[in-house]
């Protein structure tokens, strides 16, 4: 059986970025995903400006731009039906220019990413679901799973990277997930949404919040995040529409608009992950933990975590060392860089569900801009 240098589980932004990174460093990489691409995902489809340099380094930014994605100037926040406060991205200290963020449908982004991975020479196994690991002593040394024909397969590797998201096989195998705040997100694309300007519009009001942003071609992505308890036996589409239209600011934007696809949902938002208990295995992207989507940082954090992991994995190959202790450097670096963002996410959760404080902060921000 062929032994790859690295097997990557998951073909989302984190997994594709990881595969491209290691391929560019000269390693023999395989990537497995249980889906057939293109496929869709529940996502804000909003990529913060910090991702642009990473996408360019990976060689995919020009291809994304060719899709004619929407470029957003920042966010516009409404607190409990108040007028939106528009917040532009700050001017870059390096370029002196004000950056913008990409807004592009996930089914387009992920399909483009995977095509780039295939073109780079990575061996891609679509419709291959990884269900377990191969072990050599206390280190992961490959994967087992099933293909689309329910035929078992095995791939051996010197290292495995799990980019399988919030339901990653590593989280289940080693019981690593520490459940968070019980949030659930609903999303769908709409046609004809009336957005005043090129911002991601965030509306905070009970029982949750929404993010609305154009994704180009006359369509907008409308995401609702609420506590799981808000469902209370209701159908997802009923809850989604009722909550959207219960806010006068959203209602104005959605008046005359049409939902053009079924409402999708995803649970287990905002969770933490315990350390990996063995060597030969690295987790990247949402598999390493998921912060609340209100921050709009999810895809950037996935890309950046893969970039950090690539540096540590490269050092592991140079030292022929994939022990748990050696690879823990990645966890430390990730925490050092992202720790403040995770803290901010927790603070935001308290803020947006505390109406007087949320209104007070928005009023203070508005006053400071005058």
PLM regions with names:
Residues 116-254:
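Predominantly flavin-linked oxidoreductase catalytic cores and closely associated redox partners
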Residues 314-370:
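C-terminal helical "tail/cap" subdomain of flavin- and related membrane-associated enzymes
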Residues 1-12:
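Beta1/beta-strand and adjacent pyrophosphate-binding region of the FAD-binding site
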Residues 15-16:
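N-terminal Rossmann-fold NAD(P) dinucleotide-binding loop
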Residues 67, 232-313, 318:
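FAD/FMN-dependent oxidoreductases across multiple families
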Residues 23-43:
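Glycine-rich FAD pyrophosphate-binding loop
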Residues 93-115, 231-235:
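Short beta-strand to alpha-helix junction loop
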Residues 42-81:
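N-terminal FAD cofactor-binding segment of flavoenzymes
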